[in-house]
Design a protein with these regions (language model features):
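Short, flexible loop motifs at catalytic/binding sites
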Residues: 1-212
Length: 212
């Protein structure tokens, strides 16, 4: 049975022009850091609190020519929040598939929980991402569907998790901890970037780690 109001809403949403705000400006306008995240600075996100993150987000914006952004900063800095901001901007402004790799299953589970909290806190994301109990779309620990795309959050330790997933945007957390050769099939970074071959003109990659 087709739910006509829902189909109509999706059609109208697809016809709206992209906002096309740079990631940092989108974040200042829409991103909310949930209290449940444990952050001491929860509430409305403000780039001014971490001004050194602004240039990174500018580079991740669609209209910036940079294709690959690499960051190495101290622990508990802006790395993952910037990736969350980029993901949120993707869902709201220019939806497409987003591949977000973690080095271990434990970190992937933690990231998925953080993504869920962010989606719940941000109105423009909550109304676009599938609900966990949705019958029409998927929202699991590793896969979260939204209007116009899907977020994939596998670990980097299995080549099978990287195969046959086209993705315009790729983020790799703690890239230095990823295995250098996944199931004897190659570097996980190269395997992930192979998923971007159909998006050569507008792909983006964000690799981040912390200083030891």
């Amino acid at each position: 049975m087709i739910c006509y109001p829902k189909v109509y809403d999706v059609l109208i949403e697809s016809l709206r022009p992209d906002l096309n705000l740079p990631v940092d400006e989108w974040s200042d306008r829409f991103m909310i850091i949930p209290k449940s995240s444990g952050s001491s600075e929860y509430g409305q996100y403000k780039t001014s609190r971490t001004p050194h993150a602004r240039e990174v987000m500018k580079c991740l914006s669609d209209d910036h020519p940079c294709k690959r952004v690499i960051c190495m900063v101290s622990s508990q800095q802006f790395k993952t929040q910037v990736a969350l901001n980029w993901f949120g901007s993707t869902v709201h402004q220019s939806p497409s598939n987003f591949l977000w790799l973690m080095p271990t299953g434990a970190l992937a589970k933690r990231l998925s929980a953080r993504v869920d909290k962010t989606i719940k806190a941000v109105d423009v994301l909550r109304e676009r991402v599938a609900k966990p109990n949705s019958r029409d779309a998927k929202n699991t620990q590793e896969v979260k569907e939204y209007i116009g795309g899907t977020l994939f959050m596998p670990t980097a330790g299995s080549a099978a998790n990287l195969a046959e997933v086209p993705a315009r945007r790729v983020a790799i957390d703690e890239v230095d901890r990823c295995e250098s050769n996944v199931d004897n099939e190659g570097d996980p970074i190269k395997l992930a970037e192979a998923r971007q071959t159909t998006f050569s003109h507008n792909k983006k990659s964000y690799y981040y780690s912390f200083i030891q």
